[in-house]
A protein has these predicted regions:
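Alpha-helix termini
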Residues: 26-32, 85
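Non-catalytic, surface beta->alpha helical segment in thiol-disulfide oxidoreductase systems
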Residues: 61-87
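Structural micro-motif
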Residues: 51-61
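Short alpha-helical
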Residues: 13-14, 44, 75
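Local sequence-structure signature of Cys/Sec-based thiol-disulfide redox active-site neighborhoods
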Residues: 1-28
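Thiol-based oxidoreductase modules, predominantly thioredoxin-like and allied folds used
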Residues: 32-46
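Generic recognition of short, well-ordered alpha-helical segments
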Residues: 17-20, 51-52, 72
């Protein structure tokens, strides 16, 4: 299973939307619960944020590759889980 990093801002409404989508997807696809997602607040982990190529949050990286950036949709967040589970 691949490493997943989610860059967020604490007060970001789209990040909170992404959390809800993630919870819904885990209910629909129990195997997604096995995916460990490291959630990093760009204000608290500025060195990490500065080392990555993104502008909008939430942004998902799977094994260092940007999979999604910006406004989340169910399909885009599901693609993150699928990328993490892919061989």
């Amino acid at each position: 299973m691949k490493d997943v990093l989610m860059m967020i801002l604490e007060d970001c409404p789209y990040c909170h939307q992404a959390y809800r989508i993630m919870e819904d997807l885990k209910k629909e696809h129990p195997e997604y619960a096995e995916v460990s997602i490291r959630i990093a607040d760009e204000e608290k982990e500025s060195a990490l944020a500065d080392s990555l190529d993104y502008y909008y949050v939430p942004t998902y990286f799977v094994d260092g590759k940007k999979i999604h950036e910006g406004v989340p949709t169910k399909e885009k967040v599901q693609a993150v889980y699928e990328a993490a589970l892919a061989d």
